Amino acid sequence: MRIAIIGLGYVALGDALGLARRHQVVLTGPVPDRVEAINAGDFPLGDPMLADYLARHQLDIRATLDTVQALEGAELVLISAPLAFSADGEDFCTKELESRIEFAFQRCPGVPIVLRSAVPIGFTAQMRARLGASALLYAPEFLRESHALQDTCAPKFLIVGDRGALGAKVAAVLQSAALRGGAEIKLMGASEAEAVKHFSQAYLAARVAFFNELDSYALSFGLNARQVIDGVCLDPRIGTYANNPCFGMGGQRVPRSTQHLNKVFGQVPSQVLPTVTGSNTSRISLLVSKVMERAPRTIGIYNPKGVSGARDPLTLISEGLKAKGAEVREFTGDASADPEALAGFKAACDLVLAQRITPDLHDISAKVFSRDLFA
């Protein structure tokens, strides 16, 4: 089968690499460097199994800047382009996605078009009605950013927002990306599938907020947070997954789903979800105070290869520290490619903040501030 994938991010690449063992896959997107890298076999995907996977499997995959060329002869179209959030942070902006759907619908009449990234609840049904596109489906992805290929090749479950033969066909194609069978497949309505995506992300956001608050209590009252978490997670109903505290949630999809649900169901009486974002704000404020208690002259923000958005926790902490008069430096380079710059950064800072502790920081562990309890 010839499959066109609109998108060049980790979701698109995870799908493409998994499907390209059995299908002809063409990716498209407006990023020349990524297109060139993909065509050179240098896939911009940070997945630990990537090198071994490429060595073991023959893949039929290429990329192009020309969307028309990518869609030519396509028997299935996947759209894996993440949505931007509105300037006021209230909800998703769908205009760009709508134009991509319309373009694919015009170029590939009758061909199944599958939306993979999070969309507003009710969006797929609205687009189906507007375009008369009965073959437009929603099939949410649940890939981890650093393990997208691994999750594609070993899915625990697949959800497709169509309960008919078309939904079963799309599920079979997505299942073909797996290296082994066994994934549970659920066919459901489009809006229900959209809701599953957002509620699952909201649960993860609430879980992150819970363990961050546990850590905040421990910080404030002199408790050993790791010991408390280890004890709490012995209960099998809680489990040992996703329990490592962090500085906070940024503008990524987890808190966005929570905000979207708050907006969509704002008139429904609720207490848990509306407080998740507020919990994140409180977490940032506490961490800023704890850092300032150490009275460092120069504070470093260690964010290798990172591009912090306006709502990223490292950015928010940096802003909070600067507002209190602290001198803040940031390292966003490639630690392995520029060791001299990293060494200079370490030497210049009295305290270094890091979301996660990496080997690059082991030599200055005494002056690293992190809430990574499982490093």
PLM segments and residue spans:
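Structural/interface elements that position substrates and couple domains in central-metabolism enzymes
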Residues: 1-375
